[in-house]
Amino acid sequence: MENSLGSYEKELNLKATELRLGLPGSDEPEKRATARSNKRSSPEASDEESISNGSDVTKEDNVVPPAKAQVVGWPPIRSYRKNNVQQKKEEESEGNGMYVKVSMAGAPYLRKIDLKVYKSYPELLKALENMFKCIFGEYSEREGYNGSEYAPTYEDKDGDWMLVGDVPWNMFVSSCKRLRIMKGSEAKGLGCF
């Protein structure tokens, strides 16, 4: 019975699956690990240990410690990841685009467009006309958008609503937070309507 139990334990390889409170790869018992630590132990404890092991302390000092397995989570890479993520965010904000929400009075849905795709106001307005199936007409600084019941407006960084086309294109792209296509009657206070 005992032979069959012993062979069964060998087959299970209990030693390999045993849970210990040591570093990975250290197969030595806990007592020997404490003897090799950098901390000093009391002289009585070291005498007792050498007597119980039946060996001299000098023999243990000559033994080369086993190669240590790399500890999980070392070397620390958190700062590397932080810096890497920051660089990616900066690249995305500079190169990939600037998406803004576009809403239209009376439309039950919103759209998002990338302002970096367009090079000027006429391109942007043409895209908005195609997207919402409406016509804005011609823009003039004096009269706003003529021949249309809708006026494209935008909210800048300060939270002010302005007519699209009031400022130079580059300034518009850098300051636009969202676009709204208002009815001409709503946009009277913003421009020359």
From Swiss-Prot:
Q: What is its main location?
A: nucleus
Q: Name one Pfam family in it.
A: AUX_IAA
Q: Where in the cell is it found?
A: Nucleus
Position of sequence motif EAR-like (transcriptional repression): 19-23
Keywords of the record, alphabetical order, are: Auxin signaling pathway, Nucleus, Repressor, Transcription, Transcription regulation
| CC per GO annotation | nucleus
Question: What processes in GO biological process is this protein linked to?
Answer: auxin-activated signaling pathway; regulation of DNA-templated transcription
- Its domain of life reads Eukaryota
InterPro entries linked to this entry: AUX/IAA_dom, AUX_IAA, PB1-like
Where are the annotated coiled coils located?
A: none
Q: What induces it?
A: By auxin.
Q: Which SUPFAM superfamilies match?
A: CAD & PB1 domains
- Residue limits of the PB1 domain? 97-184
Q: Is Transcription included in the keywords of this UniProt record?
A: yes
Region of interest: Disordered: 16-68
Q: What is known of its domains?
A: The N-terminal half of the protein contains two conserved domains I and II. Domain I includes a slightly degenerated ERF-associated amphiphilic repression (EAR) motif which seems to be involved in the activity of transcriptional repression. Domain II is required for the correct degradation of the protein through the SCF-mediated ubiquitin-proteasome pathway. Interactions between Aux/IAA proteins and auxin response factors (ARFs) occur through their C-terminal dimerization domains III and IV.
* Similarity field: Belongs to the Aux/IAA family.
Summary of the function given for this chain in its UniProt record: Aux/IAA proteins are short-lived transcriptional factors that function as repressors of early auxin response genes at low auxin concentrations. Repression is thought to result from the interaction with auxin response factors (ARFs), proteins that bind to the auxin-responsive promoter element (AuxRE). Formation of heterodimers with ARF proteins may alter their ability to modulate early auxin response genes expression.
Quaternary state and interactors:
Homodimers and heterodimers.
User: What name appears for this protein in its UniProt entry?
Assistant: Auxin-induced protein 22D
| Annotated source species | Vigna radiata var. radiata
